[in-house]
Regions:
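Short beta->alpha transition motifs characteristic of CBS
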Residues: 11, 34-35, 119-126
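Basic/polar N-terminal segments that are highly enriched at the extreme N-terminus
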Residues: 1-4, 126-127
Length: 127
């Protein structure tokens, strides 16, 4: 059997305050609020998706034992690092300036819990 067409669908991100995280990802970053459901007294599931992405993140209550702020290296591909930096800062998000490397242009920031994100503008590949 050949394995093909695998896609990452959902990544769980640990947070301390679900409402604060939802405000950050939806209102400040501008991501789509897909789902917010309290399943039980101990389980709340919130799913948000970056515009244009097929992969979402989820956070909530009772979803993971991971310590909030320990996710590092989460990466999103973007079309324009300068525009992304302007968007982040314009929405009150502290972000590092654009880091130009031969393999891409990068902007880094953290969510309110300290989970680390990197935005990457890909460089054209010579084929």
């Amino acid at each position: 059997m050949t394995i093909s067409d695998w896609r990452i669908e959902l990544i769980i991100v640990p947070v301390t305050d679900v409402d604060r995280a939802k405000t950050f990802y939806v209102d400040q970053l501008g991501w789509n609020a897909d789902f917010d459901q309290r399943v039980s007294d101990t389980l709340r599931f919130v799913q948000v998706t970056p515009p244009g992405s097929a992969c979402s993140i989820a956070f909530g209550e009772g979803l993971t034992d991971m310590v909030p702020g320990t996710m590092k290296g989460l990466q999103i591909v973007i079309p324009d690092a300068n525009a992304a930096l302007e968007h982040l800062r314009g929405n009150g998000i502290e972000a590092q300036g654009v880091d130009d490397q031969p393999w891409g242009r990068f902007v880094t920031y953290t969510d309110p819990d300290g989970n680390g994100w990197t935005l990457q503008q890909l460089v054209p590949q010579n084929r």
